Amino acid sequence: MCESSNKTENDIVRLSQAMDVLAKLIISKQKDGSQLQVEYEHKLKELEKFINLLLGLHESTVGSMMNTSVLDMVLRNGIEIMEKDDQKYALIPIKAKEEADKTTSTIQGVTSKKSSKKKKNKIKCSFCHEAGHTRAHCGARLTVIPKK
């Protein structure tokens, strides 16, 4: 009986130590996250100062302030920042189908030169006996009206 109570006490002590280690690890990760947030905000402020310096918009010249929303749009290039549940998320737009078609057509233009050197299919159709297609794709068979 004494042995089993010692074992459970040891288990409780080990469990308590493991929980302590986990709690310390969680606290350190939270500190790291807040540290990264502070560094991010600091870098953002520095970048903002840089942009204002490059554009010649000093804080003393209030009359020559430019529309920051337009500048934000240009710099973000369609990326939208949203905040939900005290978290910031970046929404990245997916290319439109027309843009994707343009890129694939240029890729196909390059690959079409390679495919033109490819050997032609010499398979013969078992229906019309012409080379280049199979019975499943035979135009003559597909256009024939079946007899009743």
Curated annotation (Swiss-Prot):
InterPro entries: Znf_CCHC_sf (IPR036875). It comes from Saccharomyces cerevisiae (strain ATCC 204508 / S288c) (Baker's yeast). This is Uncharacterized protein YEL137C. One of its GO terms (molecular function) is zinc ion binding. It holds the Pfam family zf-C2H2_10.
